[in-house]
Amino acid sequence: MITDEKESWAAEIADHVKKQFGIAVNQATPIHKGWLNVKWKMETDQAPIFVKFYHPDRYKLHLHPEKRTAIERTLELQNGLNLSGVRCPGVYPHHDRFIQETSTGLHYAVLEWVEGDPKPAGCLNEAEMFELGQHTGKMHKWLQSARPLDKPAWQPDKEGYLREWRKNWNQAMEAGDEIVLEWQRRS
């Protein structure tokens, strides 16, 4: 993925966010974590938002509507957790849909922006562990009352992932694409 393509996606999604939610995006800063899916922190006229683009090569939501339904259900659950007081980002629905789709078929979700950095394993203090336990308890209590998923939205496929990784690595090596090679090293 070249930068121009990502900038084009960000601009198209920003326009769609304005139409769907009435939120004007002033700036989109890419977040360089993860694999294929592009994420941005978008500064808006209201508050910063987190936007996740569901890459068609990874999720194929346009071919598998059941995947979209399952992912939307997990986003709905996350939003319910947020509304019940569990500390997690809220998700912006539009007409009860949690994954939005632009006119050209870009699929994305809009979430509240939450500042912070993950703590390294083993580095939480006693107060942080206590708070984590409280919110974990709230989460489990709320989820007991929620309609469960029919099946997980995503099933890990280690062999498939490794095949895809090797294919991408070989293509990047042949092309001398250092950006993709760096993504591969991090994945």
Predicted feature descriptions by range:
Residues 1-28:
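Juxta-kinase regulatory segment immediately upstream of eukaryotic protein kinase catalytic domains
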Residues 44-148:
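ATP-binding pocket architecture of kinase catalytic cores
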Residues 2-7, 29-32, 60-67:
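Short, N-terminal intrinsically disordered low-complexity segments that are rich in Pro/Gly
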Residues 13, 35-38, 74:
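Short N-terminal amphipathic alpha-helix/helix-capping patch enriched in small hydrophobics
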Residues 30, 93-94, 151-152:
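Proline- and acidic/polar-enriched loop/turn elements at helix boundaries
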Residues 23-43:
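ATP-binding glycine-rich phosphate-binding loop
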Residues 122-186:
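A cross-family kinase active-site recognition segment
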Residues 34, 97-98, 155-156:
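Short secondary-structure capping/turn micro-motifs that flank functional sites
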